[in-house]
Every structure is written in C-alpha cells, then in structure tokens.
C-alpha cells in the first residue's frame, strides 16, 4: 500500500527556518517536509488548494456554488550529498513550486500573520535568534 502524509509547512521564524523567495519576496519557511523526505528517501509534493465557482450539474451535486481544486506537484530532490544544504535546496524548490499557485489564487491564500521578512520586526527576530543560540549553542 501507498500512503500520503500531509504536513503543514508554515512559516518558521526560528533560526532553523529557511529563507526562500515566495512571490518575489523573502520568507522564512519550515525545513521539516524536505528534511523528512530526505531522511526517509521519500518523494516530496507541493500541494495547493483553491476554490472555483461551480455551475450546472456540478453545482447541484455539490450543493454549493463553490468547489475545491487540489493540485499536487512532485518536487524532485536535488542531486548531491544528503545534509542541510540539500534540505535547503529542496525546501526552496517546493516554495518555488507553490509560488505561482498562490499568486494565481491569492484570494484563497489565508495567512493571518506576517510571512515576508520585510513585514517582520527585524530587531525582535535578531533577539529571538540570539536567544536560541544561547540556549542551544
């Protein structure tokens, strides 16, 4: 049997977060999905969901004017030795894969906190990272 494990890969403002370009802006994202894929030698997919208006029979059967579209795209693992650099490259690749979907369906992207580095308090972020380094050298 085959299994799919969905992981919410959200922003990661810790010093372990990986900077990646999302829609032309820098964001800090979680390394977890790429790290797990690498560690277990499993494929990684970028998955997006957006709404689409329904009409006719589809609308009647759904009992809703809206339908959900789920798109899954494989994100090939980068070549080279395993380790942090490969996790960083793989993470940036899945963010790049999701970027166009988010741009195309921005109204369906619900983020309730700042995502982009430009929107963060940089002094607070630096203090947080310094604290992490002191606690976990």
What are these model-derived regions, one by one?
Residues 1-137:
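Non-catalytic C-terminal accessory region of glycerolipid acyltransferases
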